[in-house]
A protein has these predicted regions:
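PLP-dependent aminotransferase class I/II
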Residues: 13-222
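Glycine-rich phosphate-binding loop of ATP-grasp-fold ATP-dependent ligases
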Residues: 1-10
């Protein structure tokens, strides 16, 4: 919601917590006249320029949250009668007040999408999501944990309609970099990854945009 051009801010419960976090964030150096480390440190410090951006963004925080809540409500209303399509909602227990930074939907496995027969037939040449930088090319378009064919088909369909929709985040334990590590799971996160999709909901997404996105989703369903 507030990125400060890099990832946001961390609010701590105490000065002690803040001090420990900053120790890790500033290379975790021990008090010697040379570099010694008893823990693995990082270099997460925010520049003065980014801090200034963050202070400026705080002025529009309330407006951004209100906009995201409005977009979420509009998606819920426009998609409520579409069979097999479900917008992830806030639990109605009164315990939560989501800022709806991310608007997600799930697609039932039995829902058929136009072009579904071509899902995962070609290797992606660029990073999905407009990510900058260098990507590692792959030989196979499929992995052992991926969105269902209808979700991938809908992503491609929306992209062809000039709408960028992304899969939800792949579970960490299914990332190749963590292959072989211990994991304790009930499988829910893998099921969500198979059926989930993120919808556009940023500050520049208008009511007209949401209606167009919903119309494209409806058009894609067979």
């Amino acid at each position: 919601m507030i990125t400060t051009s890099g990832g946001g801010a961390l609010i701590c419960r105490s000065a002690e917590d803040a001090n420990e976090i900053m120790w890790y964030a500033t290379q975790a150096r021990d008090a010697y006249p040379y570099y010694q480390h008893t823990a693995i440190g990082y270099n997460y410090r925010m520049s003065n320029v980014c801090a200034g951006i963050g202070r400026g963004q705080m002025k529009v925080l309330d407006a951004h949250i209100a906009h995201h809540k409005h977009v979420q409500a509009l998606y819920e209303e426009l998609l409520k009668d579409v069979p097999g399509v479900h917008i992830h909602k806030q639990p109605a227990t009164g315990e939560y007040d989501s800022n709806f930074w991310l608007c997600t939907m799930t697609l039932d496995p039995q829902v058929k999408i136009k072009g579904q027969e071509n899902a995962y037939k070609e290797v992606i040449k660029t990073a999905v999501g407009g990510a900058a930088g260098v990507i590692h090319q792959v030989d196979s378009p499929t992995t052992d944990c991926q969105p269902n064919d209808n979700v991938e088909a809908l992503r491609v369909w929306m992209l062809n309609k000039k709408v960028e929709c992304r899969p939800v985040w792949k579970p960490m334990h299914k990332q190749p970099v963590y292959a072989g590590t211990d994991v304790y799971t009930n499988g829910v996160e893998e099921e969500i990854f198979k059926v989930g999709m993120c919808l556009p909901a940023g500050p520049y997404v208008s009511d007209e945009d949401v209606r167009y996105i919903v119309d494209c989703i409806k058009e894609a369903i067979l």
